């Protein structure tokens, strides 16, 4: 058994300083019955806690670190830029460079606005959609988390799913009544909602691969159906690609599935591990954003040199071949975990989209939030604790996916599969 004594001491101090001792709820490790593990450093695919324990990391800061921890090119570029100043409150050439890469690679984006987080991106995109359509209602999907904006914290997933909260106190009913929530992958429910409210629906916001109820890809025809019905009713289609953007494909999920939304929200990978978000789309729509138009959005640190540098240096290293190799590694990991679980009769369903993997402790196919909730949460918690002791760092929630990076070696993956087999044997022992 590993020692977590220093983490326990650090957490005892943290709970006196921050709500729940953390700055984001899922980091509290509540659903897995552990004290939060405090990290000290990372290198490549490995991460090290303050007790000196080493882990193969499949959290990767919740997805952004597609090149692994402390990528040398990113680190060197950040050092160089930091010495010239961290933020100016004025435009820099670095903003242009990252914007050009985003526009070049994301099929639907003609103009992009940089912000500081995925939540900012989705909140801003919704305001823009309402301003463009002059409508009020938004459609989202059960179990999909689009950040902690009031309009979107309705039947959300991720940490909210783990806590069992369908929404949050503090979200006014007057706000919630403008959010329509339907099951993911259910076009009939979408069409029914549009028949009732279609003339007042400004936008449908969707993760093209749901990532906060676990990893749940779209069933064939789902995204195509959303594109069709939104066009029919004059609503905008917003892809929340904060998680999938530059993660599942060189051209993001929209490139992979061949569906172009009206607006796209980005984050995580485009920041290379620093706080960055973005939203973009057709010029006709984006030109409504201030100062070009009347839809207001601003940010003190938006487009700051450090964040732009980390994003640019990350995207610059990614090629179509990168995604082929990541997909190969992820397929091997998913297959190995499946074989290990089968060997010990562990109930499971595995979903994968590119280098994102969802391992659910249920035999039921997971296609939406309701089926994701059939997972055995106690079994997941036991699995999590055992895998941590094996040196595997996983997201401490059944409703989050695993991420791979270019730094993960074949040996890392084979070790992880062998560790899972040992854990499954103990769980069934």
UniProtKB/Swiss-Prot annotation:
BP GO terms, sorted: protoporphyrinogen IX biosynthetic process
Protein's pathway: Porphyrin-containing compound metabolism; protoporphyrin-IX biosynthesis; 5-aminolevulinate from L-glutamyl-tRNA(Glu): step 2/2
EC top class named in words: isomerase
Location of the protein in the cell: Cytoplasm
Key word tRNA-binding present: no
This protein's UniProt keywords: Cytoplasm, Isomerase, Porphyrin biosynthesis, Pyridoxal phosphate
InterPro entries: 4pyrrol_synth_GluAld_NH2Trfase (IPR004639), Aminotrans_3 (IPR005814), Aminotrans_3_PPA_site (IPR049704), PyrdxlP-dep_Trfase (IPR015424), PyrdxlP-dep_Trfase_major (IPR015421), PyrdxlP-dep_Trfase_small (IPR015422)
Catalytic activity, as annotated: (S)-4-amino-5-oxopentanoate = 5-aminolevulinate
Cofactor entry: pyridoxal 5'-phosphate
Cellular component GO terms held in the UniProt record: cytoplasm
Keyword match Translocase: no
Pfam families (UniProt xref): Aminotran_3 (PF00202)
EC number, UniProt record: 5.4.3.8
Modified residues (N6-(pyridoxal phosphate)lysine): 268
Transmembrane regions listed in the UniProt entry: none
MF term (GO), any: pyridoxal phosphate binding
Assembly, per entry: Homodimer.
Family: Belongs to the class-III pyridoxal-phosphate-dependent aminotransferase family. HemL subfamily.
Name recorded for this polypeptide: Glutamate-1-semialdehyde 2,1-aminomutase 2
Classification of source organism: Bacteria, Bacillati, Bacillota, Bacilli, Bacillales
């Amino acid at each position: 058994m590993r020692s977590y004594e220093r983490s326990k001491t650090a957490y005892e101090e943290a709970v006196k300083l921050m709500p729940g001792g953390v700055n984001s709820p899922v980091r509290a490790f509540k659903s897995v019955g552990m004290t939060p593990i405090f990290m000290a450093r990372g290198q490549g695919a490995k991460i090290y806690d303050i007790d000196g324990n080493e882990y193969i990391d499949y959290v990767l800061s919740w997805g952004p670190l597609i090149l692994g921890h402390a990528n040398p090119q990113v680190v060197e570029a950040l050092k160089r830029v930091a010495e010239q100043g961290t933020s100016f409150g004025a435009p820099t050439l670095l903003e242009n460079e990252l914007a050009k890469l985003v526009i070049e690679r994301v099929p639907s984006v003609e103009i992009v606005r940089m912000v500081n987080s995925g939540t900012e991106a989705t909140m801003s995109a919704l305001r823009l959609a309402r301003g463009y359509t002059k409508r009020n209602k938004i459609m989202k999907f059960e179990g999909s988390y689009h950040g902690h904006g009031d309009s979107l914290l309705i039947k959300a997933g991720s940490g909210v799913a783990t806590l069992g909260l369908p929404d949050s106190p503090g979200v006014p009913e007057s706000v919630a009544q403008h959010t329509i929530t339907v099951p993911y992958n259910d076009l009939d429910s979408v069409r029914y909602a549009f028949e009732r409210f279609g003339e007042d629906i400004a936008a449908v916001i969707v993760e093209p691969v749901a990532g906060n109820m676990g990893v749940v890809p779209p069933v064939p025809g789902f995204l195509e159906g959303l594109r069709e019905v939104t066009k029919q009713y004059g609503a905008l289609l917003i892809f929340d690609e904060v998680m999938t953007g530059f993660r599942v494909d060189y051209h993001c999920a929209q490139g992979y599935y061949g569906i172009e939304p009206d607006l796209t929200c980005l984050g995580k990978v485009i920041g290379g591990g620093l706080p960055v978000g973005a939203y973009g789309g057709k010029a006709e729509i984006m030109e409504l954003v201030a100062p070009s138009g009347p839809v207001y959005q601003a940010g003190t640190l938006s487009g700051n040199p450090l964040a732009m540098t980390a994003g640019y240096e990350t995207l610059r290293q990614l090629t179509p071949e990168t995604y082929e190799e990541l997909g190969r590694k992820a397929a091997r990991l998913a297959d190995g975990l499946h074989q290990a679980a089968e060997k010990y009769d562990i109930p499971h369903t595995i979903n994968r989209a590119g280098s994102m993997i969802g391992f659910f402790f249920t035999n039921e196919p997971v296609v939406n939030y309701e089926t994701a909730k059939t997972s055995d949460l106690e079994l997941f918690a036991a699995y999590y604790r055992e895998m941590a002791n094996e040196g595997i760092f996983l997201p401490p929630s059944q409703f989050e996916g695993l991420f791979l990076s270019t730094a993960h070696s074949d040996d890392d993956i084979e070790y992880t599969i062998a560790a899972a087999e040992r854990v499954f044997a103990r769980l069934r022992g």
